[in-house]
Structures are given as structure tokens and as C-alpha cells.
Amino acid sequence: MTIIFDFGGVLVQLDKQRCIDAFAKLGFDLAPFIGTYAQSGILSKIERGEAGIPEFCEEVRRVSGLPLKDNDICEAWAAFLTEVPRERIDMLRRIRKHHRLCVLSNTNEIHWALAENKYFVKPGERVEDLFSHVFLSYKMGLEKPEKEMFEKVIETLQEPADRLLFLDDSEVNCEAARKTGMRSLIAPADGSWMNYFEADGRLKAEYEA
């Protein structure tokens, strides 16, 4: 069984209001563009890979009418992510001993850089040491819940769809995965998804069937 995790809200904790407040301090109202499960406007474009960080920063300057620095804009956007609790990392390491682990996420270059350089690694480690495959919206040009994104995952992993278990905090995304034949479970943002697994990291029998 391959276990596929969402990133934001499942592994990393999110604080939308903290991000909105960070942009407000810069004089920019982010609220109309930011969502919990999906983004709009320029935020959607950076999550689909249709715009890079320079374009993102330029759009914020254009909309705000303020001469904001790229670094300040990027730091404010990074404020959306807070931390990956240690117990979740420890559980992932135990799960990996029994199951192939992957990530499937609507994310962007700034947020994933935090994953690669801060959240998932110890000195000398790489994200690839924990996850065998990483599927990111901004690299794929697709976003959940688009059917094509899940089909690409199935094609890449070369495993029967019913042997792929997707954990996401959005029921819309979970249902989209099920429509392609994948299995899916809601993964609450409070980390209680860890209860799907035994203490040693094995998926509990009732979820294997």
C-alpha cells in the first residue's frame, strides 16, 4: 500500500489569518485571494506554475500600489505555514518502514522550499529520503481536485489505483481521488489522521481492506 499525503493542513499546520495579517502590515489586502483549500488570482497562478515568484511579487506591487520589496512579500506569504509538529514527522518515519510514502499537494515554490529546507529534514537529509515521490501543483501545472492530477499520480506510481491511499483534509479532494479508483480518507488538520496507523506505523487492518 502506498500512502499519499497532502501537505498543507495535514502535515504542515496553516495559519491563514497570520498570513493575512503579515500582508496587512505591508499595506496589501490578501483576504480576497487566499483560501484554505484553494487559491484565486495570482495565488492560484503560482500554485499552478503559471507565474513565478518575480511575477507574484510584481502583481502584489501592482495591486497594492506600493513599492514593496520581494523579500518582504515572500516572507509574508511564508507566514501561511507555521510548523510540522514533531510527532507527525516521527509517525511518517515509522510509516515509511512499512509503506511507500508520497506527497500530493497544491503548493508553490515559496512554501515547498520551506518543506525542503526546514520542515522535513535533519542535517544531511533530503525530502527524498522520506518521500519516494513528490507531486506538486506548481510543477505539474495541475491542481486538486482536477481529475488529471490524480491520473498522473496513478500513471507515475505504476501501482493499481486501489492500492493507493490518499489522505487530505478536503472532502472535495478525497472524492476526486476516489473517482479515479484511488482510496481516500479525510485527514483532520488536528493530526488525528495518525490514528489510522498502528504505533509502529503500519496502516490499521480496517483501512487495508
What are these regions (language model features)?
Residues M1, H99-R100, D162-R163:
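Short coil/turn segments at beta-strand junctions that form active-site/ligand-binding loops
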Residues M1-R86, K97, N108-L114:
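N-terminal helical cap/lid subdomain that shapes the substrate entry/recognition surface
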Residues I4, L104, F166-L167:
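Generic enzyme active-site microenvironment
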Residues D6-G9, G49, V103, V134, ...:
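Generic structural signal for small/hydrophobic residues in well-ordered secondary structure
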Residues I20, I89-R93, V103, F150, ...:
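Short amphipathic alpha-helical segments and helix-helix/interface helices
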Residues R93-K97, R178:
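Anion (oxyanion) recognition and catalysis
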Residues L101-V103, S184:
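Hydrophobic beta-strand scaffold residues
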Residues N108-E109, A115-A209:
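Asp-based, Mg2+/Mn2+-dependent phosphohydrolase catalytic module
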